[in-house]
UniProtKB/Swiss-Prot annotation:
Entry protein name: UPF0145 protein
Family membership noted in the UniProt record: Belongs to the UPF0145 family.
Organism name: Listeria ivanovii
Domain of life: Bacteria
UniProt cross-references to SUPFAM superfamilies, sorted A to Z: YbjQ-like
Disulfide-bond pairs as recorded: none
Gene3D superfamilies named in the record: Hypothetical protein apc22750. Chain B
InterPro entries in UniProt: UPF0145_dom_sf, UPF0145_YbjQ-like
HAMAP family the UniProt entry points to: UPF0145
NCBIfam families with a match to the protein in the record: PRK01119.1
Length: 110
């Protein structure tokens, strides 16, 4: 499946626009990562634990969006946008949302 932030796919004709599809992931922040991140903030480093959590959440949101597109018969998603939101009373949750337009593009000729 082609997934792109572009509004079209170069060299491909869009045959059908299906609908907007979403993938959402909400993940909690680990206590041990918080301690490590606090120390890195103090000393001026990067928090690998948080970065890994962010990457995993983004990839899962995209996978979920792709699956929803497949479920309605699409073979591509265009105009993809990814949003991040910190949630919870103590900002202990991260929500990642991937959205785009599910479409059917012409079949690949080989």
């Amino acid at each position: 499946m082609i997934v792109t932030t572009s509004p079209n796919i170069e060299g491909k004709q869009i045959i059908e626009y299906k609908k907007i599809v979403f993938g959402e992931v909400i993940t909690g922040v680990n206590f041990m990562k918080d301690i490590g991140a606090g120390l890195r903030n103090f000393f001026g480093g990067r928090s690998q634990g948080y970065e890994d959590e962010l990457i995993n959440a983004r990839e899962e949101a995209i996978k979920e969006m792709e699956q929803r597109a497949k479920d309605i018969g699409a073979n591509a998603v265009i105009g993809v946008d990814i949003d991040y939101e910190v949630l919870g009373a103590d900002n202990g949750m991260l929500m990642v949302t991937a959205s785009g337009t599910a479409v059917v593009i012409e079949a690949q000729d080989y």
